[in-house]
Amino acid sequence: MKGENVFISPASISSVLTILYYGANGSTAEQLSKYVETEENTDKVSAQNISFKSINKVYGRYSAVFKDFFLGKIGDKFQTVDFTDCRTIDAINKCVDIFTEGKINPLLDEPLSPSN
């Protein structure tokens, strides 16, 4: 990824691991369970009066098959889309723009290639 910036957010990684945990089973779920948030940790942060704003959306390719348990756990955070369609990119950018109150716009400049 020469010449590209990469931003890694620990909070985002934690959120994604939690979402993946709900979609996993067996030894994968067991391994992921070591890294997901617990109510005990969340209560400690709340007690310190810390504010953090986060949005999580999971977009999956419309032709992929997803487990019902996974879909039930993440609910409205999940949407199937066509990543090569400009309307998908517009919808993702609009969601991010509204949530960040215009601070991040656009997030994506062009449709995503399925091979990337």
Curated annotation (Swiss-Prot):
A Pfam cross-reference name: Serpin
SUPFAM superfamilies given in the database record:
Serpins
Listed transmembrane segments: none
**What does the entry list under GO cellular component?**
extracellular space
A GO molecular-function term, please? Answer: serine-type endopeptidase inhibitor activity
> Domain of life of the organism in this record?
Viruses
Q: Which family does it belong to?
A: Belongs to the serpin family. Poxviruses subfamily.
**Name of the protein in its database record:** Putative serine proteinase inhibitor 2 homolog first part
